[in-house]
């Protein structure tokens, strides 16, 4: 096809305004229509990337049955704690919270993040049964346990996760069962499953138009004057304002992004078997369970990533390929 003659920018305006995300915890705006009872997402931490050799299982591929080099991402999966349950009612203005119940015993580090209610102020499970007829959604309030990882912090992240199921009563029964307990990645996902990843991307700071939007670098007179890396025209004389569509300098990176249809290649409980020699760059050793995802995952090392059941997965024609080898060689450049 070749290059377009008119190319004012290389970035999509659908993501505007490109400003910094408010929180490091991504906001989950949609959920899969899954009737399986259980959590529909799981928060993890990005450790780093490596490569693997997979046995190609596509019969139409010229590499069928052969080893194929594939980049993979390793995510550490410390157990999460279910701290509370929240019920929602569907109204004309969106979801409305009906009530919430918290576990009797809460981790002391959770008080670094939230103002915890006193014991005599906490609601019991009877408060859930009183409004269950109005409820349309059941969600679990879970928090991570970063102190069990190599990340130097104690304050946990709090994530609200929808509970799937065929009926509200079935979801609520499961929520009561897991309240106050810890869950592992194996309780939510399994190897071969297709998932989505939600995270805040790596921040780049304030960048110019060429790097931020991919506009053309001007040569000739503009370059000789030292103004080659700027927008040639930012608009007409009238109307006397600059349109929001003009590619201008500004914040680049640190945005929430969702990547769809990633495949889980492997789940494990021993982090030592996946940690490369010398540890992952800017992360260190994996101390808990882990999950290996095919391809890349947005964000730098130590970034919180939410794994969600796929909301737009196509038919899985070939299934999980055989993993022949996962590299644990040093990433230090030695």
UniProtKB/Swiss-Prot annotation:
Gene3D superfamilies: 3.30.1430.10, Ribosomal protein L3, domain 3 (4.10.960.10), Translation factors (2.40.30.10). Residues 1-21 are annotated as: Disordered. The keyword Transcription does not apply. Keywords: Ribonucleoprotein, Ribosomal protein, RNA-binding, rRNA-binding. It holds the Pfam family Ribosomal_L3. Belongs to the universal ribosomal protein uL3 family. One of the primary rRNA binding proteins, it binds directly near the 3'-end of the 23S rRNA, where it nucleates assembly of the 50S subunit. Part of the 50S ribosomal subunit. Forms a cluster with proteins L14 and L24e. This is Large ribosomal subunit protein uL3. It comes from Methanococcus maripaludis (strain C5 / ATCC BAA-1333). The gene is rpl3.
